[in-house]
């Protein structure tokens, strides 16, 4: 039986941790002048994905 392919788009966006997956937050690449320093600082951190999305990510990334 052939190997399952990983979803390349998901592989670029999600990293596995001990408790699930983490991802970078959005709204950080452009139009930053109207956003406060506090908002931009909080957006720099990585977030855990929701438990409801975990099964979908695991299915897209079988070997990661």
Swiss-Prot record:
One GO biological-process annotation of the entry reads: translation
Biased composition of type Basic residues is found at 1-44
Q: Which NCBIfam families match?
A: rpmI_bact
Write the protein's name: Large ribosomal subunit protein bL35
| UniProt region (Disordered), positions on chain | 1-48
Which GO terms fall under molecular function for this chain's record?
structural constituent of ribosome
Source organism of the structure? Marinomonas sp. (strain MWYL1)
UniProt family annotation: Belongs to the bacterial ribosomal protein bL35 family.
Q: Which InterPro entries match?
A: Ribosomal_bL35, Ribosomal_bL35-like, Ribosomal_bL35_CS, Ribosomal_bL35_sf
Instruction: Name the Gene3D superfamilies for this protein.
Output: 4.10.410.60
Q: One Pfam family from the UniProt entry?
A: Ribosomal_L35p
Q: Is the keyword Ribonucleoprotein in the record?
A: yes
């Amino acid at each position: 039986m052939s190997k399952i392919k990983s979803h390349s788009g998901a592989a670029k966006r999600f990293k596995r941790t001990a408790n699930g997956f983490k991802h970078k937050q959005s709204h950080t690449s452009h139009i930053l002048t109207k956003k406060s320093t506090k908002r931009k600082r909080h957006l720099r951190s990585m977030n855990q994905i929701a438990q409801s999305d975990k099964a979908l990510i695991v299915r897209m990334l079988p070997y990661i």
